[in-house]
């Protein structure tokens, strides 16, 4: 059975997976670090402004469902959290590095094209080309894998369909189709992969700067 998350729970899980891969020396995360990650302005859609209390409520719910664990030591005054969302010893959800990168990016940014996913997962996984991303997406969308992601109707003026995870409930394809039909058909076309690549470069720089500032502040 597929895990069903609230939007805040999805953000928490996405952040824990991201930091596990990109900053392993700072993982597991304290509540403060996790809240900062949830509210990060780069590589997040939508940008949130959550309080520590809201994040802690989500963490407590995830702990009760065994999707997050508190890894703080016996005498530690600060709780540290890590996800148990996938690839745990007794869990059902097993993801390859590429699948994990794609799911993480979707939890953090919602619907995206294969081109966008290829560039935005550059710190999470390696893909030779967009075709390889599409192959992994097809596997995740298969009934055999429980349809973890779904292909959305192509938007007017776009060349690629977007894909969305279904960990926050089954996606209403009719609603997306209706939204696409309401969009002006004269929307200019863009090279999705090139735009996504430029966005990813800017966001990676922003994220590295934010992490550097956080590290400097922790040393002061």
UniProtKB/Swiss-Prot annotation:
Which InterPro entries does this entry report, sorted A to Z? DUF480, WH-like_DNA-bd_sf, WH_DNA-bd_sf
Give the intrachain disulfide bonds.
none
Family, per entry: Belongs to the UPF0502 family.
- The name this protein carries in UniProt is UPF0502 protein VV2_0756
- Origin species, per record, is Vibrio vulnificus (strain CMCP6)
